[in-house]
Amino acid sequence: TGDENYVWKKPKDEWQAISLSYTSGTTGNPKGVVYHHRGSYLMSTGSAVAWNMPNRLNFLTVVPMFHCNGWGYPWTIPMLNGKTICLRAIDIKKIFELIEKHDISHFGGAPIVLNMITGASESERKKLKKKVFVLTAGAPPPSIIFKKMENLGFEVMHVYGLTETYGHILQCAWNDEWNSLDEDKKNEIKARQGVRYPNTEDTKVIDPETMKPVPKDGKTIGEIMIKGNIVMKGYFKDKEATDKAMAHGWFHSGDLAVVHPDGYIKIKDRSKDIIISGGENISSIEIENTLAKHPSVS
């Protein structure tokens, strides 16, 4: 229980540090990421807008606290006078039980959690009484997962972010003009990382050599870069890593992507994971997505 005698001290300014999260990315050694109050506030309000989160909602925390502070929702839900139900460990049967018991309307989870939900046995599942809204992030999801989740009564939105940006900085916001597309095309679009998240100053796919945005042709690969108040203060006691990540006034994500003509961003790979064969850049993510659609792959 909390300390009844605790007295909150107002921060001296909004740039004062509020938390320290750790990330390793693909480079191995963990780096401390320093968050400030302003960025945490912007992420919280941005999520409420992007996800159309209502006041007094019941939220299921599935994302671990050590993953970007649970994607920032420990701040978002209190702001909305909501109730947080904490899942201590990934237990699919428990997820369905908690949704029913607490009338859960929203939760977030990585694609692997969604795979576990759609692969659950009949004894583990419970029929949903109403639509449950889900955010997925942490890894590019195979497009087929959206249809599988929809069949169970979930509505999934794909978002993208990093520990260094407090969480989400892109969202695959749905456009009504896509409603008439066939299911495969819809699911393909839902797997995109999307467009700029609310309260994010700017997110672009930029050629790291020229520092110019790539054309919106869905083919030219660049690096996702971010700027604004939702970028960390820096890496804790690591000026060299901070300066490298913030070169030219942008935070360099290390994720390679293209921009489609409609402005929606789609990740192709991590810069360290791209496969080069015969002079061509081959996306390991596209290979994984193709395999996931095969009927022999569960």
Predicted regions and their residues:
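AMP-binding/adenylate-forming catalytic core of the ANL superfamily
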Residues: 107, 228, 233-234, 244, ...
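Conserved AMP-binding/adenylation subdomain of ANL enzymes
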Residues: 41-58, 66-106, 120
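Gly/Ser/Thr-rich phosphate-binding loop
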Residues: 79, 101-109, 118-188, 201-202, ...
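Conserved S/T- and glycine-rich ATP-binding loop of Class I adenylate-forming
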Residues: 17, 23-26, 59, 65, ...
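Conserved beta-loop-beta connector loops within the AMP-binding
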Residues: 196, 202-225, 261-262
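Conserved AMP-binding A3 loop
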Residues: 18-42
